[in-house]
């Protein structure tokens, strides 16, 4: 159902059971999957792809051109997976180079005032709390959680099942399964609570803890830590 005060470009492809509230504007080559709800005053730009059963709250701007001086009008996309919620005033820019894309996976929650810049790849089941700012070319693994008002530097890789505390400045890669805190960023142990919530068996969590302690707490260099893990902590 589409409200009469909504503008939809004739080139947009929208599933028949999508609900779009008033004063939303949809430009150009846009695709929206079935069961999705688009709130009022949302702007969806050319090149945006939205999956099934998503919820887009008022004020969001999706698929705007990248904030990158080298962009020169190439055909790029911003792609949002199924069952993802985009809260108020979130901005997601599309990719930069020809056929480039910004991608947000399935079952994600992107809270109010967050920004996802060009060419990011956000995995499935990720959560960004309010006002998280993610710079370009960031990769985020599945089940990552980023606390509010955190900033993520461009080209950073964030591993799966990580937890980043609110207000952190993420200026370096964050390995999988761990907690990252403070500014400057430091690693704060294994994300045991998150792993338990996601059904990891206790034996597996303890193995991850042993590996973490070997790498970060025993005083080994990287080669020594890897050798110790292979010999003493077989998977």
Residue ranges and their predicted role:
Residues 197-235:
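An accessory alpha-helical subdomain
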Residues 184-202:
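SDR active-site lid
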């Amino acid at each position: 159902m589409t409200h009469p005060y909504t503008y939809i470009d004739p080139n947009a492809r929208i599933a028949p059971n999508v609900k779009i509230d008033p004063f939303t504007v949809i430009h150009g080559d846009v695709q929206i999957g079935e069961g999705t709800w688009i709130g009022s005053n949302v702007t969806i730009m050319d090149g945006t792809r939205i999956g099934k059963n998503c919820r887009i709250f008022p004020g969001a701007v999706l698929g705007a051109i990248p904030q990158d001086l080298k962009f020169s009008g190439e055909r790029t996309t911003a792609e949002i997976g199924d069952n993802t919620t985009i809260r108020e005033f979130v901005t997601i820019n599309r990719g930069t180079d020809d056929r480039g894309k910004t991608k947000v996976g399935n079952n994600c929650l992107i809270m109010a005032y967050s920004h996802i810049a060009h060419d990011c790849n956000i995995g499935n089941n990720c959560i960004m709390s309010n006002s998280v700012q993610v710079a370009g070319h960031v990769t985020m693994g599945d089940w990552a959680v980023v606390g509010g008002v955190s900033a993520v530097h461009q080209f950073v890789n964030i591993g799966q099942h990580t937890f980043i505390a609110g207000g952190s400045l993420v200026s370096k890669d964050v390995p999988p399964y761990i907690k990252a805190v403070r500014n400057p960023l430091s690693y704060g142990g294994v994300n045991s609570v998150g792993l338990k919530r996601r059904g990891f068996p206790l034996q597996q969590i303890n193995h991850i803890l042993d590996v973490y302690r070997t790498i970060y707490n025993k005083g080994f260099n990287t080669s020594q830590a890897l050798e110790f893990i292979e010999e003493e902590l077989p998977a």
